[in-house]
Amino acid sequence: MTATAQQLEYLKNSIQSIEDYPKPGILFRDVTSLLEDPKAYALSIELLTERYKDAGITKVVGTEARGFLFGAPVALALGVGFVPVRKPRKLPRETIAESYELEYGTDQLEIHVDAIKPGDKVLVVDDLLATGGTIDATVKLIRRLGGEVHDAAFIINLFDLGGEQRLEKLGIHCYSLVPFPGH
């Protein structure tokens, strides 16, 4: 099933836009409103799964926290394992970490050292692509463990914030269901 314009418009309309959140001048795209609509949520999972069903994916990696909500169902539908990438000290086994830049400062993401095997073909899934910092760090973690990142898939792409270009410089193709301008 290829996504139709009508299906993509339905998804786009299920995402609420909140003005001045989390601070004045920001137009926040709230993917949780899509989650509240079972038809939209199921459709988003179905479209992502359909795109990657014959890609030979061996693991799906989701970034904390909303990436879990989309990545885990896609992994289940593809019949492959799901790997969470989390903030520091949230994973119980041995981990490796990667730092990334925030608007004011830095943060870190971690992954279990045994979650990705050399040669794993990985699909990274998150709810939204903005500047690409989180996914950049996630890709670096996967590669450090010997995994090959096949694609990065998103529900929303804030296309004018530079995330897609940043990931392309890493050799990562981005796929998203719903484009929005970023603010």
Curated annotation (Swiss-Prot):
Substrates-to-products reaction catalysed: AMP + diphosphate = 5-phospho-alpha-D-ribose 1-diphosphate + adenine
Enzyme Commission (EC) number: 2.4.2.7
GO molecular function annotation: adenine phosphoribosyltransferase activity
Compartments where found: Cytoplasm
Keyword terms, alphabetized: Cytoplasm, Glycosyltransferase, Purine salvage, Transferase
Pathway stated in the Swiss-Prot or TrEMBL entry: Purine metabolism; AMP biosynthesis via salvage pathway; AMP from adenine: step 1/1
PANTHER family assigned to the protein according to its UniProt record, in alphabetical order: ADENINE PHOSPHORIBOSYLTRANSFERASE (PTHR11776), PHOSPHORIBOSYLTRANSFERASE DOMAIN-CONTAINING PROTEIN (PTHR11776:SF7)
The protein's name in its UniProt record: Adenine phosphoribosyltransferase
